[in-house]
């Protein structure tokens, strides 16, 4: 696999080997602008790699170092996601500048890059995540158009499409055992969703993040039967 060197000064030392990969979209008008920002010492942001829409892969920071891509984030009790992960920025204008599908050549490059990274580090499928998974209250990337299913079919990440679970949908304002079970499942998967039994705004935000990754056809924050069934199936796969 060929990469283009584009060294960023924005990294520091790790305290442990990475065991997670976090995928982002750049969310800027052009890839050139994103690359410039990721290499700007005043910006204090970076990633390990940037993948352009034409499939070119830029190497920004050594994998052995802690790049600054995740910000305030959480997954399975870990709050230093930068320290635990390798960050990949995927060029796409994002929701603010004209979100669009990811070209096949770009997805192929991301897939190849994931295989290359995972040949060097022990990174389980359950720990290949989106920025919106680890920071659902702040981020939406790489978003509902990112082909997570195709990535999983290529051997990277989790995916499940079981039949919908029975029962009424759970929505913001609901309370009870069903909501508690939903929150407990989201927490087991990795989200910061302490079970309370009350479906509040924070729970709806996390459900939307889950849907962006694992039920992208409809991202509405409603825990319907399809959403709940996929959560249950993913918990089995991640166990």
For the regions a protein language model found, what residue spans apply to each?
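Acidic/histidine-rich, metal-coordinating catalytic segments
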Residues: 123-138
């Amino acid at each position: 696999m060929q990469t283009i060197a584009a060294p960023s000064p924005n990294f520091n030392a790790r305290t442990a080997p990475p065991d997670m990969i976090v995928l982002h979209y750049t969310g800027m008008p052009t890839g050139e602008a994103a690359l410039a920002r990721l290499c700007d010492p005043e910006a204090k942001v970076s990633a390990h790699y940037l993948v352009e829409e034409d499939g070119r892969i830029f190497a920004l920071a050594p994998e052995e170092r802690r790049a600054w891509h995740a910000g305030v984030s959480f997954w399975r009790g870990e709050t230093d996601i930068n320290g635990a992960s390798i960050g990949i920025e995927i060029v796409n204008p994002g929701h603010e500048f004209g979100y669009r599908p990811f070209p096949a050549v770009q997805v192929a490059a991301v897939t190849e890059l994931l295989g290359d990274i995972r040949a060097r580090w022990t990174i389980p499928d359950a720990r290949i995540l989106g920025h919106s998974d680890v920071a659902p209250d702040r981020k939406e990337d790489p978003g509902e158009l990112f082909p997570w299913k195709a990535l999983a079919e290529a051997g990277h990440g989790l995916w499940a499409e079981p039949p919908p679970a029975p029962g009424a949908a759970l929505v913001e304002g609901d309370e009870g055992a069903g909501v508690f079970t939903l929150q407990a499942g989201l927490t087991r998967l990795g989200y910061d969703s302490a079970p309370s039994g009350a479906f509040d705004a924070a729970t709806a935000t996390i459900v939307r993040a889950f849907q962006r990754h694992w039920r992208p056809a409809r991202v509405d924050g409603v825990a319907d039967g399809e959403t709940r069934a996929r959560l249950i199936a993913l918990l089995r796969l991640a166990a």
